[in-house]
Amino acid sequence: TAVNWLKEQNLGEYNIIHIQGVMGSAAQVGRTAAMNEMAEAEGWTIVKQQAADWNAETAQQITQSVIDSGQDFNVIYAENDDMARGAVAALDAANISHGVDGDVVIMGFDTNKWALEEVLAGRWNYDGQCNPYQASYIDEIIQKLENGEEITEKTIVMEEKGFDAKTITQEDVDTYGI
């Protein structure tokens, strides 16, 4: 998972701006729970945790407010790619380096093709993918149940992928970018 990847970076200090999606949505709940649990377990500091409702401009404003406050931070954990893009816009405007060998680690989610290209170029560090076939697979199960068919598999594990700037390839961008 994304937070495990972040832990493996061994940053020494973790001062995180956590930009959340629409509160109560499945993606927000899951991504926030993962971050909060890891931050508590590892003693990470969440400098700011605020909802941007999947909006790039709001994410940019949240990030700018932290920059203006003078608080130290070295991780942007944005719960979707658009919000990560907004956060990066604030960093760029303030001439704060980010990505591979930068001062701030950038993490997004959803594996939009343009976002994976940012990872490939080293401007972002990580982009996570929740399996895009989950919805269609769940719909298929519901239809089977509605038709009276029995579902034999009680547990289904869907693979999730994460793309790291140090290992991503152009083939990954072409295959997994949406």
Question: Where is each model-derived feature located?
Answer:
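Short, solvent-exposed amphipathic alpha-helices that sit
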Residues: T1, A26-T45, I62, G86-A90
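Solvent-exposed, acidic/flexible segments
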Residues: G24-Q28, A52, A56, Y77-N80, ...
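Hydrophobic alpha-helical
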Residues: M35, K48, A52-E117
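Hydrophobic alpha-helical segments within soluble ligand-binding/sensing domains
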Residues: T1-Y14, A59, T111-A115, C130-N147
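Local beta-strand N-terminus motif with an aromatic residue
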Residues: E13, I46, D72-F73, W124
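Short beta-strand elements in bilobed, periplasmic/extracellular small-molecule ligand-binding domains
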Residues: E13-Q20, N36-A56, E159
